[in-house]
Amino acid sequence: MAVTIQDIAKLRKMSGAGMMDCKNALEESNNDFEKAMEIIRKKGQAVAAKRSDREAAEGCVLSADKDGFAAIVALKCETDFVAKNAEFIELTQNILNTAMDKKPANKEELLALPLADGRTIADHITDRIGVTGEKMELGAYEYISGASSISYIHPGNKLATVAAFNEAIEHQMARDIAMQIAAMNPVAVLPEQVDQHIIDQELQIAREKALEAGKPENLLDRIAQGALQKYYKENTLLQQEFVKDSKLTIEQYLHTGSKTLTVVGFKRFTLNAD
């Protein structure tokens, strides 16, 4: 049975594969679309196995928020050329839409969820591997929830943030917070949420610097505590200077909207080196 251009177009729409890959799969399967899809999928699996040790350092990072739930999804690949491909971005968007709709608990659950055609996200990623010949992986799935939420995607689709709040917040103020997180990369909302190993590391560094500077040993702990407080001001969100107005901390800026307004959590993911 001859393969028609209509058959090729139909399989291409189903699989996202290239025209020649679709033509070859249809010829090999004698125009059986189910078998042709399996041929394309197996090609993707073979490519994935060959390229499993490659680094997927490029990709597309997107985020969204709705009704107090916000999520980030990152689909990674090897080259910027593929990352900017419309079908790659569309797949990332479809994965994000599914995450927003189903709210899975982790990456594994997200990969197992179906897209509109009934095939899993994992299968769709494998199919794209076969099309592009590049390693691809779901690099991140992060989410946060609260009484209200916000998302931000930095131009270029390499960095995204989400944040959640304890009460309703004006949109521009929420967006300012999401952009602050993107720009200043805080490690936590509050000092008490900073990991203990980071605290210990900062104290040790401060003590060593003071000792090298010839400070008396009986003052080292006090100097180290002062350095730690400076670290908190620079690296915990509520204590950071607001990038749009350095006279205000983020906490003070939030209180211009409501005296009880605060950030309950945030997530940030980037493909760039900070």
Swiss-Prot record:
Gene3D superfamilies: 1.10.286.20, DNA helicase RuvA subunit, C-terminal domain (1.10.8.10), Elongation factor Ts, dimerisation domain (3.30.479.20). Keywords: Cytoplasm, Elongation factor, Protein biosynthesis. One of its GO terms (molecular function) is translation elongation factor activity. It comes from the Bacteria. Disulfide bonds: none annotated. InterPro entries: EF-Ts_dimer_sf, Transl_elong_EFTs/EF1B, Transl_elong_EFTs/EF1B_dimer, Transl_elong_Ts_CS, UBA-like_sf. It is found in: Cytoplasm. Residues 79-82 are annotated as: Involved in Mg(2+) ion dislocation from EF-Tu. GO terms for cellular component: cytoplasm. Belongs to the EF-Ts family. Associates with the EF-Tu.GDP complex and induces the exchange of GDP to GTP. It remains bound to the aminoacyl-tRNA.EF-Tu.GTP complex up to the GTP hydrolysis stage on the ribosome. This is Elongation factor Ts. It comes from Porphyromonas gingivalis (strain ATCC BAA-308 / W83). The lineage of its organism: Bacteria, Pseudomonadati, Bacteroidota, Bacteroidia, Bacteroidales. The gene is tsf.
